[in-house]
Amino acid sequence: IEENRQRRKREEMVRTLQTRPEPNTAEWELIRMVTEAHRHTNAQGSSWKQKRKFLSDDIGQGPVVPTSEGDKVDLEAFSEFTKIMTPAITRVVDFAKKLPMFSELPCEDQIILLKGCCMEIMSLRAAVR
């Protein structure tokens, strides 16, 4: 039974791959635009890797201050974190602005979309480094 199930899965996969249509001209153009927007707004190179060095050894070594909720914050680590995150978030916003029709959305909808996807985009970008 398991062998039949595996065979049917393979056959279905082959059928799906054979019947999948090629993207049309408009879809290829959209793919090109998104790819170009990504390339223009994605940070590359060793400078990003240099900035993140504080993560492994330095956390907990700087001055620690309590927050109003009673949590403790390492000011130096937080400062380094914001130095990295602020430009990363700015690049995600710039990426979104380069996407077709994004700027046509109402401002409130743009903000909702950016809040919902910002961390995912930054995670994907970090994963491919």
From Swiss-Prot:
Residues 26-129 form the NR LBD domain. 3,3',5-triiodo-L-thyronine binds at R91. It comes from the Eukaryota. GO terms for molecular function: nuclear receptor activity; RNA polymerase II cis-regulatory region sequence-specific DNA binding; thyroid hormone binding; zinc ion binding. Its main location: nucleus. It holds the Pfam family Hormone_recep. Coiled coil: none annotated. GO terms for cellular component: RNA polymerase II transcription regulator complex. One of its GO terms (biological process) is retinoic acid receptor signaling pathway. It is found in: Nucleus. Keywords: DNA-binding, Metal-binding, Nucleus, Receptor, Transcription, Transcription regulation, Zinc, Zinc-finger. Composed of three domains: a modulating N-terminal domain, a DNA-binding domain and a C-terminal ligand-binding domain. Nuclear hormone receptor that can act as a repressor or activator of transcription. High affinity receptor for thyroid hormones, including triiodothyronine and thyroxine. Belongs to the nuclear hormone receptor family. NR1 subfamily. This is Thyroid hormone receptor alpha.
